[in-house]
């Protein structure tokens, strides 16, 4: 429900790229929640292979988080080509895992997700510092220029990513609950 309201709010907000990216992020998260809800409500027995498939499909959202963060600190960076390339790097192992049902492709996708998230984390700290300097150089009144909130959000995203990567391999309801608590608490 929350994600659906966010989609509606950012759809009404405007046509700027950042609002549309946040709306896209909320749409993807909303669809993932609906998928999970359908699985939880059904009498379907979630075996390990299906658990991996459910988690693998959730990984396509990781680049969208990066797109939002990049648009915040480097407006205009994202193009359709860059978006397609970043998403393709997640979709290819997902498709190969779906076709072959080999756990190797799930491991590749999870490792890529972790590596991509880690590189994004450190790159964002650099870009946030650079953007902070640019803002201070551009404006004479500097008292209200503070991007520490963005560093905090970035760190929360990274912690959630770490817990989520571990939860991909832990087929356990309790560990899934821990991930949900981290997501809600951050």
What are the residue ranges of the model-derived segments?
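N-terminal low-complexity or simple alpha-helical regulatory segments
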Residues: 1-93, 107
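Alpha-helical transmembrane segments of multi-pass integral membrane proteins
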Residues: 12-34, 86-87, 109-185
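Juxtamembrane "helix-exit" motif on the non-cytosolic side of transmembrane helices
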Residues: 34-45, 95-105, 164-174
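Phosphate/oxyanion-binding loops and surfaces in catalytic or ligand/nucleic-acid-binding neighborhoods
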Residues: 91-98, 118-121
